[in-house]
Regions:
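N-terminal flexible segment immediately upstream of the FAD-binding catalytic core
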Residues: 1-60, 64, 74-105, 134, ...
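N-terminal glycine-rich flavin-associated loop
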Residues: 13, 37-69, 87-133, 149-201, ...
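Conserved phosphate/anionic-ligand binding catalytic regions in large, soluble enzymes, centered on
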Residues: 75-78, 144-153, 240-265, 444-450, ...
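C-terminal substrate-binding/cap subdomain adjacent to the FAD-binding core in PCMH-type
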Residues: 144-146, 153-157, 164-393, 426, ...
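Flexible inter-domain linker/hinge segments
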Residues: 190-234, 511-572, 577-597, 693, ...
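Iron-sulfur cluster-binding electron-transfer modules in prokaryotic oxidoreductases
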Residues: 521, 551, 637-745, 751-950
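Non-heme iron-sulfur electron-transfer modules
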Residues: 532, 539-543, 576-612, 633-660
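Cysteine-centered iron-sulfur cluster-binding motifs in ferredoxin-type domains/subunits
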Residues: 556-577, 612-634, 894-895, 922-923
Length: 950
C-alpha cells in the first residue's frame, strides 16, 4: 500500500494521465525498477510520460507533496542512477521526435530516441551522432546526454558537453526553459531572477578562485563524469549556456531534459584498422601515448580533425583469452608466461583514400621503435577489420558469460591522464590481482586513458561485500591519490561513486556542486541518493539479487541465467513499451523463482504469477529477435515456451488437444478449409465493414480469433497438381483423372524426374498448404503455384515429400509450449525430407521463413533454404528480371533477420524494382503464428510505425 501522500498524488495525476500509463501493481513496479546496474530499488509508482506538459504537471505535484522523482529512458545505465523507491517517470517511447538543420550540421532530438537511430537518420548526409558509447544501439539520447556517456572515438572533444548547442528543460518547480529560444530566455530571466543571478554568482566565484578554475580544466582534460559538470562555469559567459551544459552528466538530479540541439559530426568515409600485439602491457601503453601525439599538417582543420589516430582500444591478456583470440593462443603455446601479451586495436580515418594511406604510413613510422609480436598490418577492408572490432565487442559477453550462478557482472570505469598510462595500467592490473579477481580483465579506450575492468562479483555473503568494498577503496586510492584521475569516466556517478565525489574533487569543487544542486533542486526531490549521498556505504547497499531460474541445462532457455539485465535486448523486443520487455520478463521470472524456492511469501508469489499471464506470457511473440542484440545471445522466447509448457503439462486437456492435432494433422487441416470458406462467404454477403464489426465484437466478448479483411480463402496444394503435371511432363497427362491428393502429387513429380535436370525438394508450409489468397487480392495465384512456376522457369524439377499434408516443422506446438510434440513433428519432417532429397543430395526449399528457421535448428544434415535465399542463390542467373517502376516495400521477417538474410531479400527486391523501401523501426510484426488473431493489439502495436512511412 502507498502512503497517504502517494495516494493524494495518485488521485491528482489520474486526472492528467491515462490510467494505462500509471503503474502501481506489484508486477510492473518490480519490472521497471531494474536497470543495467547491480542495484535495485522498487518504485512506489511508475508513470510513462508522453509530453513535456505532463512532466511539468508531474513535477509540480511532486513538489507539492514532497515526493522524490527519478527519470528513466532506456535503463542501460550502470551505476544505479535510473532506479527509484519513490516515483519513476519513464521518458522512452513516444519521445522520439527529431529535426535536422538544412546544412545537416545540427540535430534537435527528444530524449527517447536511440543513439543508433540518430546515426541512421544522419547517415545519408555523411554525418553522425557525436557520442559513441558501446550501448549506442540501445541507449537513448536522454540517458547518453545526462550521463555524458562517450565511447571509443568521441573522447572529450566530441562528447555531449562539447557538441551541445542548447537544451529544453523542465525544472523542479515545473517551469519550462528553452536555452536556445530568445523568448523563453527572456521570460525565464523575468520570472526567475534569483535563479539567473545565482548562476552568474557561481560563475564569477569559481573563476575568481584560480586554483579551483585550474583544477576544473585539468580534471576535464580527460574523461570525467564524477559529480556534477563544473566545466560550463569556466567555458561559458552566458548564464543560459551554463544552464544548458550543466544538464550534461547531471543524471536527472537537476532537471528533466525534454529536448536537446547538438552539433553533428562528420563521418569519415575511409577507415582502416590494425590489431597491434605487444609482449608487455607497458610497451602497449607507451605506443598509445606516442600515437596520441600524431597530427596531420592541415592547419585549417580542428585539432580533433587533425588527429591521425582516432581510436586505440587496449585489450589485456585476459581479455584476449576470454574471446580465444588466435594470436594470443599461438603466443601462449610459444612462451611459459603469456600474461604480458597486450593488444591495441588502432583505427585511423580520413576524408580521402590518399589521406588514409598517408595516415597509415605515419602510424607505421611512429611504431618502428616499438617491438610488436607480429608485424604491424593495417586493413581498410570492412570484412577484415570488422573481425577485429568483433573481438573487441566480444569481451564483455565472453567474460560475463563465464560468471558463476548468482554472481553479477560489474563493469568499473576509470580514467588516467595519458602521460601516466603505462605505470597506471600496470598498477591497476596488479591491484585487481591482489584482491583475487582472477577472471577480471582490463580493456577500453586507451587513447583517452579510459579503462573498464570487468568483475564477476557475488554479494551473497558479508565477506563478498567486504571484498568488493576493499577493492573499491584501493581503486579510489590508486586513481585519485596516486594519479589524480577519474573514478568515473563515462558510466555516471550514480550511487556507485556518490560516496567518493568529494574525495576525488576536493572541498571547494564539491561545495560548488552542492550549490548547483541546491539552486536547481532546493527540496532535494530529483533523483535523491544519486551523485549526492550522505551514506558513505550507499555503494554497498541495495544490491540486485540474481536468483537462478530452474531450467534443464539441456534446454536452450537455460541461457537466461546468464542474463545481466543490461537491456540491450529491448531494442528488438516488440512488446517493449507495450506490456513488458524481454529483460523485464527475465527479471520477473527470477523473482517468481526466488519466491517458489524460498516459500517465504506465497501471497506475493500468487499475485506475481497471476499478473504475469497477459503482459509476460500472452503478449510475448516468442520469436527470439531479442537474442540478436543480446551480448549473451539469450532468446527470451525460449523462456516463454518453457512457461507455456508448465501451463500445459502432459495429461492436461490442452496438451491432449495438441497431441490429437499432431496425430491427425492432415484431417485437422482439411477441417479448417470449410471454416475459411464460410468466413469468405460471410465476407461476401455482409461486406467488409459489417463483417469486421461483428467479428470484433465476438472476439471481445467470446475471445474467438479476430477475423480481418486479409483473411485468406481456403486452398489445397493438389488443386494445382494437374497444371504442374502438364507443365513438367507429357507422361503426366494420363494422371488427369486421378484424385487430387498429395500422395498422387508426389507420384507425379517422381515420374517427371530425369537424371540431368536440377532438382529441389519443395515443402510448402502448413499455412500455404491450407490458405490461399484473400478476397480482392491483387495477386492472381497462391504462393505455392507461384513458387512451382518460378522453379520450373529456372529449370528445376520439383520433388515433394511423401504425406506432405501430414508434415509440419513443429513451430505450432513449440509456440504453445508443447516442446516434445514439436520435436516429434520435426523428426517426422526430417525423415520425409531425407528420403525425398535422396539422403541430402538435393536442396530443400520451404516457403515460410519461420518454418525454415525452426527446420534449420532441428535438422542439421540437409541444405535448407527459404524462397529469397534460394532464388538469389540458384535462380538469379537463370531468370530474366524485369524491374517495375512502382515502389516496393519490403518487410523483413524476424526469422530472416535471425538467419542473416535481411540483405538477401533486399538485394532480390532490387532486381525486381527500381525503388525498394524498407520501413524504418520495424522489427517483429507481432503476428507470431496465431497471436495476430488472438491478441491483435500486439500486432497493431508492432506495426504502428510503417503505415505513415508507406
Amino acid at each position: 500500500m502507498v502512503k497517504s501522500s502517494y495516494t493524494s498524488f495518485l488521485q491528482e495525476i489520474r486526472g492528467l494521465i491515462p490510467q494505462d500509463r500509471i503503474y502501481t501493481d506489484e508486477l510492473r513496479r518490480l519490472a521497471w525498477g531494474t536497470d543495467a546496474g547491480f542495484y535495485r530499488l522498487i518504485p512506489q509508482i511508475v508513470i510513462r510520460s508522453n509530453s513535456e506538459e505532463e512532466i511539468s504537471d508531474l513535477l509540480r505535484l511532486a513538489d507539492r507533496y514532497g515526493l522524490p522523482v527519478t527519470f528513466r529512458a532506456a535503463g542501460t545505465s550502470l551505476s544505479g542512477q535510473a532506479i527509484s523507491d519513490s516515483i519513476l517517470i519513464v521518458a522512452g517511447k513516444h519521445w522520439e521526435k527529431y529535426s535536422i538543420s538544412p546544412d545537416h550540421e545540427q540535430i534537435t532530438l527528444q530524449p527517447g530516441i536511440i543513439g543508433q537511430r540518430v546515426n541512421e537518420i544522419l547517415a545519408p548526409y555523411g554525418r553522425k551522432f557525436a557520442p559513441d558509447p558501446a550501448s549506442v544501439k540501445s541507449a537513448m539520447v536522454g540517458g547518453i546526454v545526462m550521463n555524458n556517456a562517450s565511447g571509443m572515438n568521441c573522447g572529450t572533444h566530441a562528447n555531449s558537453d562539447k557538441v551541445l548547442l542548447s537544451a529544453r528543460i523542465v525544472l523542479a518547480d515545473g517551469t519550462m526553459l528553452d536555452t536556445g529560444d530568445d523568448i523563453s530566455r527572456a521570460s525565464f530571466e523575468a520570472t526567475h531572477p534569483d535563479f539567473y543571478n545565482r548562476i552568474c554568482e557561481l560563475r564569477d566565484q569559481i573563476r575568481a578562485n584560480e586554483e579551483l578554475a585550474a583544477r576544473i580544466r585539468y580534471k576535464y582534460s580527460i574523461k570525467n563524469v564524477t559529480g556534477l559538470n563544473l566545466l560550463p562555469f569556466v567555458r561559458f559567459d552566458d548564464p543560459f549556456d551554463i544552464i544548458a551544459h550543466l544538464m550534461v552528466g547531471s543524471e536527472g538530479t537537476l532537471a528533466f531534459l525534454s529536448q536537446i540541439t547538438m552539433r553533428t559530426e562528420y563521418d569519415y568515409p575511409h577507415k582502416a584498422s590494425a590489431m597491434l600485439y605487444f609482449t608487455n602491457i607497458k610497451d602497449a601503453c607507451r605506443a598509445v601515448v606516442a600515437m596520441k601525439e600524431l597530427s596531420n599538417d592541415n592547419t585549417s582543420a580542428s585539432e580533433a580533425d587533425r588527429k591521425i589516430v582516432k581510436g586505440a582500444e587496449l585489450l589485456d591478456y585476459k581479455s584476449l583469452s576470454s574471446v580465444e583470440d588466435p594470436v594470443y593462443l599461438k603466443y601462449k603455446q610459444e612462451v611459459a608466461d603469456a600474461s604480458g601479451l597486450t593488444a591495441v586495436l588502432t583505427e585511423t580515418k580520413a576524408r580521402t583514400r590518399e589521406e588514409l594511406e598517408q595516415n597509415i604510413s605515419v602510424i607505421e613510422e611512429c611504431l618502428k621503435p616499438f617491438s610488436t609480436y607480429i608485424p604491424v598490418h593495417f586493413t581498410d577492408r570492412p570484412e577484415e577489420y570488422s573481425k577485429y572490432w568483433a573481438i573487441r565487442s566480444g569481451i564483455f559477453p565472453s567474460v560475463g558469460g563465464t560468471r558463476q550462478p548468482g554472481t553479477t557482472c560489474l563493469i568499473e570505469d576509470v580514467a588516467f591522464h595519458i602521460e601516466d598510462l603505462p605505470e597506471a595500467t600496470a598498477d591497476l592490473q596488479q591491484l585487481i590481482a591482489r584482491h583475487g579477481y582472477d577472471d577480471a580483465c582490463i580493456y577500453g579506450h586507451a587513447l583517452e586513458g579510459n579503462y573498464h575492468f570487468i568483475l564477476n562479483q557475488s554479494f551473497s555473503t558479508d565477506a563478498d561485500v567486504k571484498r568488493y568494498e576493499d577493492l573499491m577503496n584501493d581503486v579510489k586510492t590508486l586513481v585519485v591519490d596516486k594519479y589524480d584521475g577519474s573514478l568515473k569516466a563515462e558510466h555516471g556517478t550514480g550511487r556507485n561513486m556518490a560516496p567518493f565525489v568529494k574525495y576525488e574533487w576536493g572541498e571547494a569543487a564539491f561545495e560548488a556542486m552542492k550549490a548547483v544542486k541546491q539552486l536547481f533542486d532546493p527540496k532535494g526531490l530529483l533523483n535523491p541518493g544519486v551523485i549526492f549521498n550522505d551514506d558513505p556505504q550507499c555503494h554497498i547497499k541495495n544490491f540486485k539479487p540474481l536468483p537462478l531460474i530452474p531450467i534443464d541445462e539441456a534446454s536452450p532457455a537455460e541461457k537466461v541465467n546468464k542474463c545481466i539485465e543490461c537491456g540491450f535486448c529491448e531494442v528488438n523486443c516488440l512488446s517493449c513499451g507495450f506490456t513488458l520487455s524481454s529483460r523485464q520478463r527475465i527479471v520477473l521470472q527470477r523473482e517468481i523463482s526466488r519466491l517458489k524456492q524460498s516459500g517465504t511469501d506465497p501471497e506475493r508469489l500468487f499475485l506475481l504469477e497471476k499478473q504475469y499471464r497477459y503482459p509476460g506470457n500472452q503478449t510475448c511473440a516468442g520469436d527470439g529477435l531479442c537474442s540478436m542484440s543480446c551480448p549473451m545471445n539469450i532468446n527470451t522466447g525460449d523462456l516463454t515456451h518453457i512457461i507455456r509448457q508448465e501451463t500445459l503439462p502432459k495429461g492436461s486437456l490442452g496438451y491432449k488437444a495438441g497431441d490429437f492435432v499432431a496425430n491427425h494433422f492432415a484431417g485437422v487441416k482439411s477441417s479448417l478449409r470449410p471454416v475459411l470458406s464460410l468466413a469468405n462467404f460471410g465476407h461476401s454477403v455482409l461486406g467488409t465493414k459489417a463483417m469486421s464489426s461483428i467479428t470484433k465484437g465476438m472476439h471481445n466478448v467470446l475471445g474467438i480469433p479476430l477475423w480481418t479483411p486479409a483473411m485468406p480463402k481456403s486452398y489445397k496444394v493438389t488443386s494445382y497438381k494437374l497444371q504442374v503435371a502438364t507443365a513438367t511432363s507429357n507422361e503426366l497427362q494420363a494422371t488427369s483423372t486421378m484424385q487430387n491428393d498429395s500422395a498422387t502429387l508426389v507420384a507425379c513429380s517422381s515420374v517427371a524426374r530425369n537424371s540431368t535436370a536440377d532438382k529441389v525438394v519443395y515443402f510448402p508450409s502448413c499455412i500455404n498448404q491450407t490458405m490461399g489468397l484473400p478476397k480482392k487480392s491483387p495477386v492472381e495465384q497462391p504462393l505455392v503455384n507461384k513458387m512451382i512456376s518460378l522453379l520450373q522457369k529456372g529449370g528445376y524439377e520439383v520433388i515433394f515429400p511423401k504425406d506432405m499434408d501430414k508434415l509440419c516443422c513443429g513451430t505450432i506446438w513449440e509456440s504453445k509450449g508443447m516442446l516434445d510434440i514439436a520435436d516429434r513433428k520435426a523428426a517426422e519432417l526430417e525423415a520425409a525430407l531425407w528420403e525425398a532429397s535422396e539422403q541430402g543430395k538435393y536442396p530443400v526449399l520451404c516457403d515460410q521463413s519461420p518454418c525454415l528457421h525452426r527446420m534449420r535448428e532441428t535438422i542439421q544434415k540437409m541444405k535448407l533454404y527459404e524462397p529469397a535465399e534460394f532464388i538469389y542463390t540458384f535462380l538469379r542467373d537463370k531468370l530474366v528480371f524485369t524491374q517495375t517502376d512502382r515502389p516496393v516495400a519490403v518487410h523483413i521477417t524476424c526469422s530472416m533477420r535471425k538467419m542473416g538474410l535481411a540483405d538477401t531479400i533486399v538485394s532480390l527486391a532490387k532486381l525486381c524494382a527500381t525503388h525498394v523501401f524498407v520501413p524504418e523501426e520495424v522489427g517483429c510484426c507481432g503476428f507470431a503464428g496465431d497471436r495476430g488473431f488472438t491478441y491483435p493489439e500486439l500486432n497493431s502495436y508492432a506495426l504502428r510505425t510503417p503505415r505513415p512511412q508507406i
